[in-house]
Amino acid sequence: VGGMSTAPYLSTMISEKIEVARIINAIKIIQRTTNLPISVDTCRAAVAKEVLELGVDIINDVTGLKYDTMMPKIIERFCPSLILCAYSKKIITGNQLQETKQLLKKSLEIAKTAKIPRTKIVLDPAIGFFRKKGRNPF
């Protein structure tokens, strides 16, 4: 479930308040109809905190814990499963496989520092993202 598009080539930033409102409405509907795990896409710690308090199972951070410095603390506190995407503010050039690997290593280092268990982490190479100039600040 996402409240804000993460399309890197569009200007899609919205306020945290709007993002939370969109996600919470969707979560409540899903929770009324199923017991399946719920994953939320967000790179903002305040949003993650709100949805984790509602019982969300997975956080998918397209920035690999690199956008919001508070995100690792929130993940450590609630201990959900975590999807880390290969993320760079710069355009990935050269050997994309090697650069993607390094980006994921950096995210894993951030997670390790925050004592996030590796068994809770899924890595996403984010192929198609950050391969050319984007318009989002994250």
Question: Residue spans of the language-model regions?
Answer:
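Catalytic alpha/beta core domains of metabolic enzymes, predominantly
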Residues: 93-138
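Catalytic beta/alpha-barrel core
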Residues: 34-44, 57-68, 86, 100
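Acidic (Asp/Glu)-rich catalytic clusters
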Residues: 52-53, 71-82, 115-117
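Catalytic cores of alpha/beta
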Residues: 45-53, 59, 123
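Generic structural signal for well-ordered alpha-helices
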Residues: 23-27, 48, 69-72, 101-109
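Hydrophobic faces of well-ordered beta-strands that scaffold small-molecule active sites
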Residues: 1, 38-40, 58-60, 80-84, ...
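Alpha-helix-loop-beta-strand connector modules within alpha/beta enzyme cores
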Residues: 11-40, 50, 77-87
